[in-house]
């Protein structure tokens, strides 16, 4: 069975729409991660002001997010940690993720791959 020109055109249109939607989802995932990271930072600052130990301040933000979004605390914690890493160590990756040029899986892979790379080398690799 051969595809007609119309079938090929329709398939290409569907693939292009999939690319657009995939990019839009990435933008929303980046925004969600940024909001989770912002809540963590807010809670951490509040708790440090109240005298909570530096090591534990902000820990419960992942629980709060998990309850609010009906997701596991671990999932929220992973997104918060990714957000902190991208903010602090991988700004080009964060920018690409926020623009929808890469998705969550790619942002996570870049972050993990560059985790133990020295700062001066990481900036060039990123």
Model-derived features: positions:
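Peripheral, non-cofactor segments flanking catalytic/redox cores
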Residues: 1-126
């Amino acid at each position: 069975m051969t595809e007609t020109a119309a079938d090929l055109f329709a398939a290409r249109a569907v693939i292009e729409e999939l690319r657009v939607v995939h990019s839009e989802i990435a933008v929303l995932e980046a925004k969600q991660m940024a909001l989770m990271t912002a809540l963590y930072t807010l809670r951490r600052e509040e708790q440090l002001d109240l005298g909570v130990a530096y090591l534990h301040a902000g820990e419960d933000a992942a629980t709060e997010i998990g309850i609010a979004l009906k997701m596991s605390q671990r999932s929220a914690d992973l997104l918060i940690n990714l957000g902190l890493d991208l903010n602090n160590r991988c700004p080009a990756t964060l920018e690409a993720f926020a623009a929808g040029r890469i998705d969550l899986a790619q942002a996570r892979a870049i972050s993990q791959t560059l985790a133990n790379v020295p700062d001066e080398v990481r900036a060039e690799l990123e």
